[in-house]
């Protein structure tokens, strides 16, 4: 497929669920910056500006507003699995929206083509990753807070 299924979105959800809005967003920005300067942190151990300007670039750039949406939602609610799941599903939709718009213009697809190439194939696996990010993220964050390793965010 033009757009691969990766663990990146799971990682973004986990990082922001655990670290919160500010630190989670900073971590995502650092991840994108490291990839942009050429470190092989993107899918298939790739990096560089060419990746950001290629077919997957919209998804990667979309990780920034995704982190903000997840972090903001969790900041305004109690840390529960349900809230974390809603936050991560919203984040997934933000990532897919950025990716589809980017893909539409880069590949000169119709909106329908962008939807069928860049969104629909990722919905089920995206929900599975959102469930995992919420489940693991809430447990890890609560334990880090209980151990006074991470302040309550």
State what each model feature region is.
Residues 1-25:
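Hydrophobic transmembrane alpha-helices
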Residues 49-97:
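Short helix-perturbing small/polar motifs within transmembrane alpha-helices
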Residues 39-45, 102-116:
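Interfacial helix-loop-helix junctions of multi-pass membrane proteins
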Residues 1-4, 32-66:
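Interfacial aromatic-anchored transmembrane helix boundaries in multi-pass membrane proteins
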């Amino acid at each position: 497929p033009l757009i691969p299924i990766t663990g990146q979105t799971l990682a973004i959800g986990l990082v922001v669920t655990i670290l919160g809005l500010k630190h989670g967003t900073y971590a995502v920005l650092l991840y994108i910056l490291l990839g942009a300067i050429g470190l092989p942190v993107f899918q298939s151990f790739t990096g560089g500006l060419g990746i950001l300007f290629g077919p997957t670039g919209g998804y990667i750039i979309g990780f920034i507003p995704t982190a903000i949406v997840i972090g903001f939602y969790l900041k305004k609610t109690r840390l529960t699995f349900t809230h974390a799941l809603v936050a991560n599903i919203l984040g997934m939709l933000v990532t897919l929206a950025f990716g589809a718009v980017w893909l539409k213009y880069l590949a000169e697809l119709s909106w329908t083509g962008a939807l069928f190439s860049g969104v629909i194939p990722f919905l089920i696996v995206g929900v599975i990753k959102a469930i995992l990010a919420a489940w693991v993220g809430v447990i890890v964050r609560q334990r880090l807070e209980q151990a006074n390793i991470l302040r309550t965010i």
